């Protein structure tokens, strides 16, 4: 009995060459619908699926291969005499190669289509054949990825058959794909029904292996969401090396922080912590303000902009060593300047941050929560003195920055510049002291969480702070309010805390 391959693909890249190879090895080809037509038109001797099933395609193509004469030929164990006896009695031909790729649900779910239109891209027959072939991998070679055509061709050419090791690997790739595919469908179907479903299905596809993880002894890779075109899976690298694991984490924060602002803004960042944040009339002014606050820490840092980078800004940035620059666009002459630094990673972003959920792994579990996308609940002035309009602008600026600083976090600022940033401390007074020490001339103070005691207010008064913004909610809020009134400081509550761990 001749060996037989069943080919049914949406993505036809490379399939004609692969089919020609199979025919050259005396392997029969059975195919369906558009694939059958494509192969036939290109001179391939191919059997249409309904010649095997004696049953026509139906329901607008929804039912083509869902038939015992197909699946028995895939699932029969060749060394099982009873299985082979059944095939012989019912004149069922074995299927030795299953070549299937799926309807592009991953791509279509992100497009501007109706719910019903997206549902039509949920593949049924393809996954069923793939799973059947993968289960019976000892007897069937299953190909779900066009990149594996060459692997199979080489083994048949060199050894006359596909090795069991390769068959098992290909089968594993099928179940890996199906897990992601089914997960994407589940998330799509439950999107408006359950915020936190009983089973968490995450669907990500590998973008690339990374040189190493957070440290050189840790292996790492980066994966792209199949459901969302976010900022970090759609950017272009215009210059420099591939991003490292730490680069990915840092760029994410720098880009998010810069995009908190409506006006032109720049966020300079090191080790996932902002070291300079400022707004200005343009990217140049914002960068220079951020740089001048801390010209030491910015060395080797990541720079995020929310506006196009011009030549003048580029000329300033290449004066120091930087790891990455992230911006929505670059003037051509700016790009020429930046490319003089061959190792400087220059990224062009196409999407603003849009994450709605964030996940963190702990040992044996995963934590899922809403992304911290809200800044304030409402502004409530709680002191005798009210902040001026200028102070209120700076208070909101400070709260936008403090969101991105490790808790406990304090930011002091003036005129759209984060002059002092203190964070990552186990009490609130230490980051206050750090921020004030660095932030000479600051007039406002922003805190990521409430004040358990009045000590922060007292320190702020010593440092010349005129207005404070914090969430409120402490049992001792009144002590802090009284302290502000004593010092003539305005204070507002926002109702929202911004812990970052």
UniProtKB/Swiss-Prot annotation:
GO terms for biological process: 'de novo' IMP biosynthetic process. Residues 1-144 form the MGS-like domain. Its EC number is 2.1.2.3, 3.5.4.10. One of its GO terms (molecular function) is IMP cyclohydrolase activity. One of its GO terms (cellular component) is cytosol. NCBIfam families: PRK00881.1, purH. This is Bifunctional purine biosynthesis protein PurH. Belongs to the PurH family. Disulfide bonds: none annotated. The keyword rRNA-binding does not apply.
